[in-house]
Amino acid sequence: MKFSQIELEQAIQSIPYIQNLSALYFSQEQVSFEITFDFEELDKPIDFNIIIDQAYPLKISDSESIRFYLKDDEYKQFSHVMLNNAICFHNQHCITFHKKLQQDFQAIKQWIVKYIINLEKDEHYEHLITENCTYKETYFSFQFTDVDESFSQNEIGIVTNTFLTKSKYKDKDMYHYLVQSFTHNMTQRNCQWSSFYSNKENNLSGIYVFIGKRPSIYDRFSFSNWQEFKSLFNQEMLSEIWKITFSIQQKYIPIFIGYNTKNQDIHWQVAMIDLKDQFFKNTQGIYELCDKKINWVISKNSSYHYFFGRGAFHPNLTDKKVLIIGLGAIGSQVAKTLVRGGCKNITIADYDVKEPENICRSEYNFLPPYTNKTDELAGILWSISPFVELSSIRHLATEYIKFDLPSECLNFLSEQFSEFDYIFDCSTDDDLMYRTGKLSLTSTIFNLSITNHAKALVCGISPNHYRFVKHQFDNILENDTLDLYNPIGCWNPTFKASYNDIAIMVQLSLRTINLMIQENNYQNFTIQYDDNLNLKVERF
């Protein structure tokens, strides 16, 4: 321990609202003792068991290394009390034992005042505290989204699920499923995944029961035994569940318990049930819930607004159709960032193939060493977001546009390009930039180019993007055209810059573009380093 028993006793005795230090056990691995909180505002004292781990006063992972356990179960009704009666709290960093101990005891006193004395409620919604169990020594997870239609009280139906992947979770295997639909009679409510995911095969059926009310104790803890559902599952409901279980030819079935949250969302808690060992029995048409533990598994509302709730681009970008031309160092990073930023409809275009030397500064993987850039990047983008509608083209946007075409073909190309709201031209192809400048487009083009060694980035915006970019490279910026990287063989030389160099420029340019879209104020701009390596965005 980083403190002695005497230091601990003296520190506790110095806290005026702490009494009755007893049952003290002190070792180098762990310390435990009992104390009482007692101060003027309390109707009666509150007793605690306390355990301190040897890392104290430092945290262990993201948890405090001191734990306060309430001795009386009556306090489980209050916020932030866990199933084991421990109070969940997070305190400030402190490396001084005496100061940290006072700080932690003060945090518990503040919790008592706020929740027990003043009976305050947290405004933000919290899910029920649930023990996530294994089924047959395996963990399960189910991802779902909001659906457009509502559910009726006590409605029962079929859930279809798609297997996603298998992973390690803690020390066991975990199987991950995507919820596809909820079907009752002839009404099917579909989760709002992209077509790439919604078109996948359904390979696990389940049952859903919408009860409306949270299946909880103190409105905080999930039921842990099936008999606790007695007041929520009537005979008619159990009869319907019984019939459905026999129509599903599986060894196990997930059962989804649905209820309304105070945010007016619907949450689904999922339990795994074994058809050979049901959670209720049928005795001559009379159904009775068994005294059995509920095997709750992980379920998550991964709707778009939660999935991107921690940060996304402006809706005027994410809700629009986007075309990205050129999927090299710049374009692949642009594509990946836009998808992580919540963009829902993206088309990627590149005629080229990925080779091993492309990987070090792009968003591609080593395996397979050779493949079409559009094909590999599409797979990467789908693995990031289950909401992006993605398509790809290889030649139209990069080659056909350069042909000597009659006016009707140029009009056709203009119509094709104008289907997009925003076009990110990351090809660094001057010929392509010139041709897009000659088309009559309703879309906005952002042409992104980087100088050698990534000392500057230029963003030209239509309709004058060609003129602006050429002027910057030919007359304004310093661009070393001699010290280039020459691949082995007969290839065009390319600029020198690391992944880090390029990413800094790309991320700042996308931040600037997102802001311009939000403000509806489009200006050409450059990004350059000054003499002190500070980046400066200059608009024109």
Please give the residue ranges for each predicted region:
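N-terminal charged helix/coil linker that caps or initiates catalytic domains
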Residues: 266-322
